[in-house]
């Protein structure tokens, strides 16, 4: 084994282990396994044309040279992105820490208490600063949060408004341009009409159901929306506000002047700009709207012994359960960045946050005074951080731009000739003086002696915040680096991640996030670039984006790529919007139905609804495949209305369906398009591709197939790849003048993630990617062979093999022992493992996806654990142990119970805590017992201030 190649570091199975595994599976070679697993008519005939694989050192040099092409000017463009200081203790211990960035969404709450507490901190920060009682634990970005607010208000229309068909959304003209563009994209398929104008001039009419305003607004002006909000409420309209989260440390918060929803970006709470993302959007609202709010909510609960703990609350709202009835299609959001923003607030505390906000405001105030003295006219009387400057007659915008660039400064240039300056926490006296100097040079005015910037500046009384915030003790205690580091580590020890053991979640692809892929993200040249700088200042990013797009086109067999969607769900929505735009362009806008197999992930029907379609379910047969006759019958019956088929390949049942090309042909014969859900692309790369099977568009999950981390629930990236005829309808961006189908705030979405995937593809090369896919299929079939006798495998392909994942049968176990798949998942925690996917796509089962990154030793240990758990279940079935008091129904067993004085169970502590030798050698201690889900939903406590007393 040549260990110096990256592929051999990434792939867990060595050549010497291959014969043993193949023998267990019952094949003679990897090629034979693939030929018996994937239909012959879709196998690629030639290797991917991706160039030779780079070594880790070569990639480090390459990505370093690209980074050096980015020019880091001092940037005061603002418009939703601002330079900030990421505390080193947070960067080192969270952002660069695999325990935090390789963990999964905290559905298994007992082994996720650390990040659940961190996310509850974030929710508390948002709730306090907005003065609204309920916040979620992040959305994708500010613009998509605005679209979610619009959809939520539309769904909250009164019966009278629905009867009157009120469908007008008023958006104030002083909202960020990219936010308005994303709102428009969402509004069209939902049947909303967007009316843009000045809130001051609005006359409320019965057809208006909601309003969106910005605070401070696009020009930096702080507006008093109290009277406007009262007028809206008087006629039954809701009001949502996009609020600068840092400004709310000084300004009257939206909740105090009547807003129903507040949303925005938490980027300036310590998250770098990353050329547009990722950063965590926030969303807060009133308690009565908790079941209508998008995104995940963390809440308090208790474990079975009454200890306070954390969990994801109100999960039945989510798209994977509600499907087409869900209020949102959001799954992955921005958990890692929300965690960082929460820690930023913990580290600084209320006084520190206020000091930072005061500094920002004071710099802006100082600049306003000095610029006025030079003859410039301020267009916004009340401001927080942003000045809109009218130039004197003797100064042109081009002169200002030229002088600014000569001083390596970026400003914002409005279409009417005004200039914008948005300062931030990094802006120093020297920076502000240099800004002043460039305006003095432009006006040919001498620089007079200027006073120092004060520590704070006055805020007009009507806008001044008087209420307190961040009063919980967590925001008072950890202000030294030592204490902060220990707090982070204390939380970290409560969570299972890929740093601990395999996470075998089916359809989630929890593969290695290699250090060599992650390291570039800590380079300032990738971290600190504003997304709206001139392209020549982002040459490194532009080259990377071009190269990665070409790689993804090659891998998928498609002609075009958009990197804009910020998650897989966003990719689904975007792909469907592209289909709709194409069909409208050829006079087929009447197509309104999307066929979706019954086995599909709930995001598919939820995304279809968001894109303005009506889902139509087609059946699956007893083997888990799409029922071809049902598909054909429904497609032909609705031939003129059918827009698309959404299909996952390999299927959500873990099978490569033999008839996939015929399925696509049936849809195309009806004049419709095929959307391939790329969630399972890890079973395709290098062996087949969406273009070959006959799809027209697919999304990819970079956080699954292409090695970017899950981050405990985000960030994700969901780029879409499309066939030639769909390329003209890919998303544009307001900054380029192309407003078509814009779906995220930044032109390239979460561009800061892209170096990870680029590194993965460059270092794996075509052969490495192909071998990774082969190994993923090998590992899944090995586990199936090892566990089939103990549990049973629900679905197999026609030759008896599974794809890159497989479904374990647990329903018979439940019938005979009373032990559920949930009990098995909780018992796995005692063994140091995260559960596989529960009850999806088949109720009462466990879906397992080992990925290519796991070693044979880890696979064998997992098999030992699963077999041992099956033996524990057998003891219940035979009556050897108590059906009501055993290691499974009582799992997990927290440390405090194991070491406690009282022990009332009929089995010993050692059996509970150390069931096999591998656990004795490396025990992961759990800090809570099984959590009461009902209590946490019945009484939602979504901040750190909650209490069940």
Write out the residue ranges for each language-model feature.
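Non-catalytic terminal extensions of PLP-dependent enzymes
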Residues: 1-24, 36-76, 85-101, 107-110, ...
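TRNA-binding/sensing appendages of the translation machinery
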Residues: 27-41, 259-264, 695-698
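N-terminal export/assembly segments and adjacent metallocofactor-ligating motifs
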Residues: 105-115, 121-123, 136
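Conserved PLP-enzyme active-site core in the AAT-like
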Residues: 114, 144-309, 371, 384, ...
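A conserved hydrophobic secondary-structure block that centers on an alpha-helix together
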Residues: 125-146, 165, 169
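Short helix-loop-beta connector
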Residues: 132-133, 557-559, 587-590
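General small-molecule cofactor/ligand-binding pocket signal
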Residues: 135, 193-197, 379, 412, ...
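Conserved phosphate/anionic-ligand binding catalytic regions in large, soluble enzymes, centered on
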Residues: 271-284, 288-289, 333-337, 422, ...
């Amino acid at each position: 084994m040549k260990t110096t190649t990256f592929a051999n570091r990434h792939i867990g199975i060595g050549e010497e282990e291959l014969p043993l595994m193949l023998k267990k599976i019952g094949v003679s070679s990897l090629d034979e396994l693939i030929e018996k697993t994937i239909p012959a008519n879709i196998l690629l005939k030639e290797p991917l044309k991706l160039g030779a694989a780079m070594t880790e050192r070569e990639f480090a040099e390459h990505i370093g040279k690209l980074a050096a092409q980015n020019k880091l000017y001092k940037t005061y463009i603002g418009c939703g992105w601002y330079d900030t200081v990421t505390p080193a203790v947070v960067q080192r211990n969270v952002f660069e820490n695999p325990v935090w960035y390789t963990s999964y969404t905290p559905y298994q709450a007992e082994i996720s208490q650390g990040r659940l507490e961190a996310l509850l901190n974030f929710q508390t920060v948002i709730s306090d600063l907005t003065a609204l009682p309920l916040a979620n634990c992040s959305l994708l970005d500010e613009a998509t949060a605005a679209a979610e607010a619009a959809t939520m208000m539309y769904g909250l229309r009164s019966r009278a408004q629905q009867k009157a068909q009120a469908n007008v959304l008023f958006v104030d003209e002083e909202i960020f341009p990219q936010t308005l563009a994303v709102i428009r994209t969402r509004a069209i398929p939902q049947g909303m009409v967007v009316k843009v104008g000045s809130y001051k001039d609005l006359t409320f009419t019965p057809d208006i159901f909601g309003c969106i305003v910005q605070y401070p607004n696009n020009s930096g002006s702080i507006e008093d929306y109290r009277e406007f909000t009262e007028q809206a409420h008087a006629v039954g309209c809701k009001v949502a506000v996009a609020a600068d989260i840092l400004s709310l440390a000084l300004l009257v918060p939206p909740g105090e002047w009547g807003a129903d929803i507040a949303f925005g970006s938490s980027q300036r709470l310590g998250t770098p700009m990353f050329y547009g993302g990722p950063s965590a959007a926030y969303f807060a609202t009133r308690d009565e709207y908790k079941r209508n709010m998008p995104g995940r909510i963390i809440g308090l609960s208790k474990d079975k012994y009454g200890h306070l703990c954390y969990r994801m609350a109100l999960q039945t709202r989510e798209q994977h359960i509600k499907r087409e009835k869900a209020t949102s299609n959001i799954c992955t959001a921005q958990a890692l960045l929300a965690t960082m923003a929460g820690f930023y607030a913990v580290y600084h505390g209320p006084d520190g946050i206020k000091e930072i906000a005061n500094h920002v405001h004071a710099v802006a105030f100082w600049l306003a005074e000095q610029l006025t003295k030079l003859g410039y006219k301020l267009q916004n009387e009340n401001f927080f951080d942003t000045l809109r400057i009218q130039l004197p007659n003797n100064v042109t915008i081009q002169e200002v731009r030229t002088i600014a660039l000569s001083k390596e400064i970026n400003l914002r240039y409005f279409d009417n000739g005004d200039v914008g300056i948005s300062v931030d926490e990094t802006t120093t006296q020297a920076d502000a003086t240099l800004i002043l100097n460039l305006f003095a040079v432009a006006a040919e005015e001498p620089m007079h002696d200027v006073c120092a910037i004060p520590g704070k500046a006055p805020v007009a009384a009507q806008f001044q915040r008087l209420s307190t915030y961040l009063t919980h003790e967590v925001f008072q205690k950890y202000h030294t680096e030592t204490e902060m580091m220990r707090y982070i580590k204390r939380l970290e020890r409560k969570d299972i991640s890929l740093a601990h053991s395999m996470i075998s979640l089916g359809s989630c692809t929890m593969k290695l996030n290699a250090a060599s892929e992650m390291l570039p993200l800590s380079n300032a040249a990738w971290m600190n670039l504003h997304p709206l700088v001139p392209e020549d200042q982002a040459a490194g990013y532009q080259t990377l984006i071009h190269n990665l797009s070409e790689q993804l086109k090659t891998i998928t067999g498609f002609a075009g790529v958009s990197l804009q969607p910020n998650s897989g769900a966003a990719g689904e929505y975007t792909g469907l919007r592209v289909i709709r735009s194409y069909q409208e362009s050829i006079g087929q806008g009447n197509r309104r139905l999307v066929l979706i197999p019954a086995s599909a992930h709930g995001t598919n029907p939820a995304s279809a609804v968001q894109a303005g379609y009506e889902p139509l379910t087609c059946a699956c047969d007893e083997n888990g495949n799409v029922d071809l006759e049902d598909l054909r019958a429904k497609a032909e019956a609705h031939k003129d209305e059918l827009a698309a088929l959404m299909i996952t390949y390999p299927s959500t049942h873990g099978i490569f369906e033999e008839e996939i090309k015929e399925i696509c042909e049936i849809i195309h014969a009806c004049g419709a398009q095929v959307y391939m859900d790329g969630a399972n692309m890890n079973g395709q790369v290098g062996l087949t591709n969406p273009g070959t099977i006959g799809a027209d568009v697919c999304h990819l999950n970079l956080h699954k197939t292409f090695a970017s981390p899950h981050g405990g629930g985000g960030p994700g990236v969901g780029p879409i790849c499309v066939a030639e005829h769909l390329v003209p309808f890919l998303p544009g961006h307001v900054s380029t003048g192309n407003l078509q189908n814009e779906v995220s705030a930044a032109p390239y979405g979460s561009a800061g993630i892209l170096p990870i995937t680029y590194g993965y593809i460059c270092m794996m090369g075509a052969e490495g990617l192909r071998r990774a896919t082969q190994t993923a299929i090998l590992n899944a079939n090995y586990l199936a062979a090892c566990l089939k006798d103990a549990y049973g495998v629900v679905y197999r392909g026609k030759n008896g093999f599974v794809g890159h994942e497989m479904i374990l049968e647990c329903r018979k176990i439940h019938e005979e022992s009373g032990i559920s798949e949930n009990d098995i998942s909780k018992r796995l925690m005692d063994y140091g493992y995260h559960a596989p996917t529960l009850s999806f796509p088949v109720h009462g089962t466990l879906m397992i996806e080992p990925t290519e990154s796991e070693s044979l030793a880890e696979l064998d240990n997992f098999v030992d654990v699963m077999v041992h758990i099956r033996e524990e279940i057998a003891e219940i079935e035979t009556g050897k142990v108590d059906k009501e008091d055993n290691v499974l129904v009582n799992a997990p067993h927290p440390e405090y119970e194991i070491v406690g004085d009282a022990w009332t169970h009929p089995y010993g502590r050692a059996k509970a805590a150390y069931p096999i030798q591998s656990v004795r050698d490396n025990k992961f201690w759990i800090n809570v017992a099984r959590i009461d889900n009902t209590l946490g939903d019945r009484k939602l406590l979504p901040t750190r201030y909650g209490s069940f007393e």
